[in-house]
Amino acid sequence: MQDFTKYLSTAPVLSALWFAILAGLLIEINRFFPDALLFPFG
């Protein structure tokens, strides 16, 4: 189990988890506020 927790704290696993969370957050923001880039120019 200690090896598994050490594996989960390695850089590729943490970066993949971070990018998945970030992508989900961006998708949800775009779902609730679509075309947010067009607001300042509108």
UniProtKB/Swiss-Prot annotation:
It is a single-pass membrane protein. Pfam families: PSI_PsaJ. It is found in: Plastid, Chloroplast thylakoid membrane. The chain crosses the membrane at residues 7-27. GO terms for biological process: photosynthesis. The keyword Membrane applies. GO terms for cellular component: chloroplast thylakoid membrane; photosystem I. The keyword Transmembrane applies. SUPFAM superfamilies: Subunit IX of photosystem I reaction centre, PsaJ. It comes from the Eukaryota. May help in the organization of the PsaE and PsaF subunits. PANTHER family: PHOTOSYSTEM I REACTION CENTER SUBUNIT IX, PTHR36082. This is Photosystem I reaction center subunit IX. It comes from Chlorokybus atmophyticus. The gene is psaJ.
